[in-house]
């Protein structure tokens, strides 16, 4: 089974209209660009990040660790204008939703998506650019096969 950040990255890179909208600049902190290189990515761009996981028992009476992890990955959209950020964010949401539906139709194993959150639109004076982040959360079972290729 693919990790959440890989699913998001693959979904975004598979869509030709989104790739065209950002000039092919869809990168991942896990595969291509480190956090220090994010400031040097030309605009507009999309940066996919693996934001880690959390394992928490349902109650204090449970074991200290359960088989389920809550995994988080994000899509950061950077652009020159707020309007462009919003347009690309909407495209990202549509693309990811369609990609996951297609994976389910093909009976591919995917993590159980729990929620989607969005940050507020913000200004980064150091880059400089406007940006917004979509954060996807899912539940995975640590007993499932998560080996990397």
Q: What is each PLM-predicted segment?
A:
Residues 1-62, 147-149:
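Small/polar-rich, solvent-exposed N-terminal microdomains that initiate assembly or binding
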Residues 56, 83-85, 142-146:
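Residue-level signal for secondary-structure boundary sites
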Residues 66-83, 129-141:
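Oligomerization/assembly interface segments of phage tail-like spikes and tubes
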Residues 39-67, 111-130:
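Short, charged, surface-exposed interaction patches
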């Amino acid at each position: 089974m693919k990790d959440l950040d890989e699913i998001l990255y693959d979904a975004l890179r598979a869509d030709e209209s989104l790739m065209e909208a950002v000039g092919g600049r869809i990168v991942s902190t896990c595969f291509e660009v480190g956090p220090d290189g994010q400031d040097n990515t030309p605009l507009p761009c999309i940066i996919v990040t693996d934001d880690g996981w959390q394992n928490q028992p349902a109650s204090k009476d449970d074991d200290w660790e359960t088989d389920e992890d809550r995994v988080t990955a994000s899509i950061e959209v950077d652009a020159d204008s707020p309007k462009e950020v919003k347009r690309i964010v909407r495209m990202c949401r549509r693309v990811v939703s369609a990609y996951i539906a297609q994976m389910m139709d093909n009976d591919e194993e995917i993590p159980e998506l729990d929620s989607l959150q969005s940050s507020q639109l913000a200004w980064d004076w150091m880059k400089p650019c406007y940006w917004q982040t979509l954060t996807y959360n899912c539940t995975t079972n640590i007993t499932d096969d998560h080996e990397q290729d």
